[in-house]
């Protein structure tokens, strides 16, 4: 088995999908989880206005709405959480995403004060954060807020991770990568667009350039610039297509270097790290 085949298998990626079937699969997956643990009353998700959180949010709200109708349990809710650092650059996109999703409840938690307070506490301890590390601090603060909300609403935190993100490890460890349940896992980036199109999402929300927008020195840095490959490259790779060797090498390099992000904490029984 080639490394490409190993990766495709590990991430459950498929070369072709039926958008309607995958929408139903994700919605039913979320519903089944909540029905299995009836003490759970909410799905909690951070909404940025980008493709992944918009899609995940719509799936969450659909699942909750259907489950309420099926069970008569009005306590079930989907909570969309806005988590700006100060003023969000693409504020209108976030508003448009909220309008499309129509969440049961929208909360806004501005993380700037908490991030700056943490940075100052570290500075006083003699640790000066780089801009890159501060970016990860933002991602972790966002997740911290979501878990606090989930804890107070008997909920689970929903993630937006998908195959095109997982293969490169393009998420913050214990930040946006630290979630309870990931309904998009298996899909690549272009497949996510197919689902949003099928759901009637405004095109500008999934045709915009994806960005984590965590760095102050490089605001709205496109994911593709940070990764050194395009999402089309990554999607082609995950669909089993043959890529230029230099492109495949970059993708596989990201996969190997970030394997620890896709695992629970490393123990003496693990040996995957020996190949990195």
From Swiss-Prot:
UniProt-listed GO biological process terms: NAD biosynthetic process
Signal peptide residues on this chain, from the entry's feature table: none
A Pfam family that the UniProt record links to this protein: NAD_synthase
Domain of life: Bacteria
Family matches, as CDD domains: NAD_synthase (cd00553)
Catalyzed reactions per annotation: deamido-NAD(+) + NH4(+) + ATP = AMP + diphosphate + NAD(+) + H(+)
GO MF term list: ATP binding; glutaminase activity; metal ion binding; NAD+ synthase (glutamine-hydrolyzing) activity; NAD+ synthase activity
EC class of the enzyme, as a word: ligase
One GO CC annotation: cytoplasm
Annotated keywords: ATP-binding, Ligase, Magnesium, Metal-binding, NAD, Nucleotide-binding
Binding site for deamido-NAD(+): 140, 173, 180, 260-261
Pathway: Cofactor biosynthesis; NAD(+) biosynthesis; NAD(+) from deamido-NAD(+) (ammonia route): step 1/1
Enzyme Commission identifier(s): 6.3.1.5
Binding-site positions, Mg(2+): 52, 165
Binding site for ATP: 46-53, 160, 189, 211
Assembly mode: Homodimer.
Function: Catalyzes the ATP-dependent amidation of deamido-NAD to form NAD. Uses ammonia as a nitrogen source.
Record family assignment: Belongs to the NAD synthetase family.
Protein name per Swiss-Prot or TrEMBL: NH(3)-dependent NAD(+) synthetase
Organism listed in the record: Citrobacter koseri (strain ATCC BAA-895 / CDC 4225-83 / SGSC4696)
